Every structure is written in C-alpha cells, then in structure tokens.
Amino acid sequence: MNDFPEFMKNPKNRIHSTSDYMAGLEGYVFDGADGSQIAFWSNRNAGTGAEHKHPYDEYVLAVEGKFTVCIGSKRIPLAPGEEYVIPKGVLHFGERIPGTRTIHAFGGKRAVRESEFKG
C-alpha cells in the first residue's frame, strides 16, 4: 500500500495545516469518547517538524518510509512497524523522508480539522 484507504481520508476529518508542525503533510483525525485522538499522516516530501510538547502522551507508529523522533540530541529512527511513546511534557520533533506514513495516538486533543479552524 502506498496510501491510507479512502474511508480513512474523509474530507470532514482532514487536519488543518496549522496542526501539522511540518509543511507538506496530509493528515486526518478521529476522536475518542475520552478526548483522545488518532491521526494519520502522509507526506510526499522530506521534512522536519517544529519542536513542541503536549500535556499528554503521544504514541507513534511508522507505517511506511522512515520517521525519526528527535528529543534533545537523541534521535530514534522508526522503520515501518516500529513504534515509540513520547511522554507528556517532553520537547520533541520529527523528521520524515519522502513517502513516509505514520499513525499517531494522542492522550488529548491535538489536531484541529479544517472545518474547525477559526483562523
């Protein structure tokens, strides 16, 4: 597979670009009843995200390509099928090679849909 299935890419769930922390991403989000979120991101180009932190844990699963979790000077490369948990409050950012797809689970609301963005 080179992309997520169409049913996972409903335009109503498209993540607004201000939630991406990295240019060139295409993302979709689903919400849990407890306020958690699952996000699916694909990118066509290489990129490095902005450093940030969350008030909740983040789980990352690399599906395709390579995603590198960066925490301070530590770099954790994730190949397809590899996963990592970023504890809440930890400053981090990610790096992607072209064609990378990832799934992220957040213990709180992280992503804003295009339809929710108030600019």
Provide a role label for each language-model segment.
Residues 35, 45-55, 111:
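Short beta-strand/loop turn elements enriched in aromatics
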Residues 33-34, 70-74, 97:
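Short strand-coil-strand connectors
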Residues 43, 53-69:
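Short, conserved beta-strand element in jelly-roll/cupin
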Residues 73-88:
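Short acidic-glycine-tyrosine-enriched beta hairpin
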Residues 40, 69, 102-104:
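Short hydrophobic/aromatic-rich beta-strand segments that constitute the beta-sheet cores
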Residues 1-40, 50, 119:
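A short, N-terminal "cap"/entry segment at the start of jelly-roll beta-barrel domains
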Residues 63-64, 80, 98:
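A cytosolic small-molecule/anion-sensing beta-strand core signal
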Residues 88-114:
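Ligand-binding loop in jelly-roll beta-barrel domains
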